[in-house]
Amino acid sequence: MIFGGAFDPLHQAHIYIAKRAVQAIKAQKLYFVPTAKAFFKSPIKASNQARLAMLRVALKALPQMAVSNFDIKAQNGFSFNTVQHFKQRFPNAELYFLIGSDKLSELAKWHNIEQLQKLCRFVCYERFGYPIDEQLVQQFNVRLLGKCPLDLASSEMFGSHKFRQIPAKVLHYIHQHNIYLKTILQTLLDEPRMQHCLRVGQLAKTLAVANKLDGKTAYTAGAYHDLAKQLPQAQLEKLAKVAGVNDYPSWKVLHSYAGAYILKHWYGLNNSAVFSAIWNHTVPPQKMSQLDMIIYLADKLEPMRVHEEWAKGIDITALVKLAKKDLKLAYQITLKYVRSLQKN
């Protein structure tokens, strides 16, 4: 059985459907075949190699399923070519092609659909919002699987709790390699703010390495530090309350708490060091970890800050240099300066 799609990202509905199809058809093997980026109708966010890797992580514990890189390797854009490839590979096998009801209405437009029907049989599951057209079922001799109970679409995973509907091991892999970091930022931030976040991430990584800390963790915390910065006040206050924050000097500091909460509870990033660094970057507590200090400094000292009015009273270049040798001293100097501005 062939199951094509972007899988960008793979989610629990994909796994549910695949298991249901294997069981219903009694298929010996189901192959996930990720579409080549150049041929998918919508922009694909993750690289070809990242999508293949995520699928392999997900399918390790599912021996009846495997990943095929045919479409990606061949830069193939037609399902007909995909099915031909599998027919050549398994000449005596009965081939099935798994589709959702959203694709059922498009079958008549598929390349070489008449020949394709001779090579395989279509198996269709019903997706939310795409009712089954019985006339098309008859026309294309489609076998129905029933309705998928999970209302999920890869295009709707970002900016909501639905991202948690990614298999746990895949979710861990995504965050380990920051596969969707820019996409997550773009969901909530405009371009200038996102670029600020990426610069903070880069400087945080540099400072972490200089202080013998993990650069990747620092980059992640730095890049995500302002994730919630542009949310409206009412939403920030609501998220802060849910996160347990009721006492704060101004609603403008709430993005740190909201951002940490969103990363953990929407996107499933369970890293206490990253959470702490983001949480503490607006109102630093008495006790700050090294990573906390690094994110605070990277936010205040990233390269473009030199053009901002508030930073004219400090030497950003000198403080960055100092932070590589004496992190705590650089933090204390910067914090003292920032607090002096707040008093004025």
From Swiss-Prot:
GO terms for MF: ATP binding; hydrolase activity; metal ion binding; nicotinate-nucleotide adenylyltransferase activity
Domain of life of the organism encoding this protein: Bacteria
Pathway(s) annotated for this protein in UniProt: Cofactor biosynthesis; NAD(+) biosynthesis; deamido-NAD(+) from nicotinate D-ribonucleotide: step 1/1
A Pfam family reported for this protein in Swiss-Prot or TrEMBL: HD
Catalytic activity: nicotinate beta-D-ribonucleotide + ATP + H(+) = deamido-NAD(+) + diphosphate; P(1),P(4)-bis(5'-adenosyl) tetraphosphate + H2O = 2 ADP + 2 H(+)
Keywords: ATP-binding, Hydrolase, Iron, Metal-binding, Multifunctional enzyme, NAD, Nucleotide-binding, Nucleotidyltransferase, Pyridine nucleotide biosynthesis, Transferase
E.C. number(s) listed in UniProt: 2.7.7.18, 3.6.1.41
Every HD domain range: 193-304
Keyword Transferase: yes
Residues given in the record as Fe cation binding sites: 196, 225-226, 299
Residues covered by region (NaMN adenylyltransferase): 1-182
Presence of the UniProt keyword Metal-binding in the record: yes
Cited function: Catalyzes the reversible adenylation of nicotinate mononucleotide (NaMN) to nicotinic acid adenine dinucleotide (NaAD).
Family affiliation: In the N-terminal section; belongs to the NadD family. In the C-terminal section; belongs to the Ap4A hydrolase YqeK family.
Official protein name in the record: Probable nicotinate-nucleotide adenylyltransferase/Ap4A hydrolase
Organism: Mycoplasma pneumoniae (strain ATCC 29342 / M129 / Subtype 1)
